[in-house]
Swiss-Prot record:
The lineage of its organism: Bacteria, Pseudomonadati, Pseudomonadota, Alphaproteobacteria, Hyphomicrobiales. Residues 254-452 are annotated as: N-acetyltransferase. Residues 233-253 are annotated as: Linker. Keywords: Acyltransferase, Cell shape, Cell wall biogenesis/degradation, Cytoplasm, Magnesium, Metal-binding, Multifunctional enzyme, Nucleotidyltransferase, Peptidoglycan synthesis, Repeat, Transferase. NCBIfam families: glmU, PRK14353.1. Acetyl-CoA binds at A366, N372, Y373, S391, S409, R426. The active site is at H349. The gene is glmU. It comes from Rhodopseudomonas palustris (strain BisB5). Pfam families: Hexapep (PF00132), NTP_transf_3 (PF12804). Mg(2+) binds at D108, N230. PANTHER family: BIFUNCTIONAL PROTEIN GLMU, NUCLEOTIDYL TRANSFERASE. Its cofactor is Mg(2+). GO terms for cellular component: cytoplasm; membrane. This is Bifunctional protein GlmU. The keyword Transferase applies.
């Protein structure tokens, strides 16, 4: 089959005023990834597929995010908001370069899939000049209705203009569209603004195609996939749908989720085989969990890798830059950041490990702190393989604890400890025999009321 070229234009110029936020609407996250990023990830990616994003003025943050996600993408500014067709023509320069297929999508529909983009293109290869994505709405009120005659799309009728019979139609316009790229620019240029708002509506392209005797088609998807995000409530609804998808995909791949509805995943979370995630775990962006690992309840993991057969939690926090080796253990109330913890090492309780490397098989006692920040700079702590750090120790970085070395409980270590050595830093213990009894007796006498 001959390879066909495509240009996808993603409209992302909306202010999102109903979000009540200074953050551009398309940069709000779902499953740890901006709305726009989900759409760009789903859009065609091949060598013959181009991408353009239309942004609003003063939305440099959106342009920057676009380049981060898809360095190949171009951005164009829609200086005035005069309707969807006007927005598409902001990328006129890209359209004019030519492509077999022009795809138009929206930056606030994070649930759209790559499969839907592929299905949208198929009718163009079979003779259609325009394809509209539709969905069966549970409540079609407010949506444009797709009027179908036989197997062709006859019109998109807005709610205010629909007849009584047309209002009964539940097949609604999702806004996503594909146009034969050879005629796309000519059709878009023909769209006028003779309406109450004086705007240029992309939906008018259907009528133009019909006037030219060209075929317009509809493909359907489920309503969830084309949810647009305009409010924080809709953002939360999309998050819920996305989480259900991610959990289902994880379980299908063999991950055990205990009470899946309580577990939060990120869009880019990667799992190995036979992973178990207990209740109330939050996994943020940039996390990979290898075969056989167990994440216990109430743990929070972001930007970290967990090795095979490792154990995390309960009540553990793994921050960005944490790398947990095979069979290593992070226990309850432990926080790690920018830390490499090698295979078999144990950090079991009440500990902070930051900017550190813990060698294979080392044991870190309860209450140990790596003191990594001096108020200006971060410093590293190196703990050798097989080392033992006693409870309630403070390791003042930069410092190195050698292979097989011991640190006595309660020590404040400020100097390097050689291999197989013992470091103890604390005052000699003083014992005063009978002192406690005398103290109680003296205190009791002092509390007796004085007689007048």
């Amino acid at each position: 089959m001959t390879t066909r070229t495509s240009l996808t234009i993603v409209l992302a110029a909306g202010e999102g005023t109903r979000m009540r936020s200074s953050l551009p609407k398309v940069l709000h996250p779902v499953a740890g990834r901006p709305l726009l990023a989900h759409v760009l990830a789903a859009a065609p990616h091949g060598a013959d597929d181009k991408l353009a994003v239309v942004i609003g003025p003063d939305h440099q943050a959106v342009a920057d995010e676009t380049k981060r996600i898809r360095p190949d993408a171009e951005t164009f500014v829609q200086s005035e908001r005069l309707g969807t067709a006007h927005a598409v023509l902001a990328a006129k320069q890209a359209i004019a370069r030519g492509a077999d297929e022009l795809l138009i999508a929206f930056g606030d529909t994070p649930l759209i899939s790559a499969e839907t983009f592929a299905r949208l293109r198929e009718p163009l290869r079979n003779g259609s000049a325009l394809v509209v994505l539709g969905f069966r709405a549970a409540d079609p009120t407010g949506y444009g209705r797709l009027v179908v005659e036989g197997d062709q799309l006859a019109a998109i009728r807005e709610q205010a203009d629909a007849s009584a019979d047309e209002l009964k139609i539940t097949l609604c316009n999702a806004g996503v569209m594909a146009i034969d790229g050879r005629i796309a620019l000519d059709v878009l240029a023909q769209i006028g603004n003779a309406n109450k708002k004086g705007e240029y509506y992309l939906t008018d392209a259907v009528g133009i195609m019909r006037e030219r005797g060209l075929r317009a088609s509809v493909i359907e998807t489920d309503e969830d996939e084309v949810r647009g995000i305009n409010t924080k409530a809709q953002l939360a609804e999309a998050e819920a749908v996305m989480q259900t998808r991610l959990r289902q995909a994880a379980m299908t791949a063999g991950v055990t989720l205990i009470s899946p509805e309580t577990i939060h995943l990120a869009a880019d979370t990667r799992f190995g085989k036979d992973v178990t995630i207990e209740q109330f775990v939050v996994i943020g962006p940039g996390v990979s969990i290898a075969d056989g690992a167990v994440i216990h309840s109430f743990s929070h993991i972001v930007g970290a890798s967990v090795g095979s057969n490792a154990s995390v939690g309960p009540y553990a926090r793994l921050r960005p830059g944490t790398s947990l080796g095979d069979g290593a253990k992070i226990g309850n109330f432990v926080e790690t950041k920018a830390a490499r913890i090698d295979a078999g090492a144990k950090v079991n309780h009440l500990t902070y490990i930051g900017d550190a490397h813990i060698g294979e098989g080392a044991n870190i006692g309860a209450g140990t702190i790596t003191c990594n920040y001096d108020g200006f700079n971060k410093h590293r702590t190196e703990i050798g393989a097989g080392a033992f750090i006693g409870s309630n120790s403070s390791l003042v970085a930069p410092v190195k604890i050698g292979v097989g070395a011991y640190v006595g409980s309660g020590s404040v270590v400020t100097k390097n400890v050689p291999d197989d050595s013992l470091a103890v830093e604390r005052n000699d213990q003083t014992v005063r025999v009978g002192w406690a009894k005398r103290f109680r007796e003296t205190s009791a006498r002092a509390r007796k009321p004085k007689t007048s």
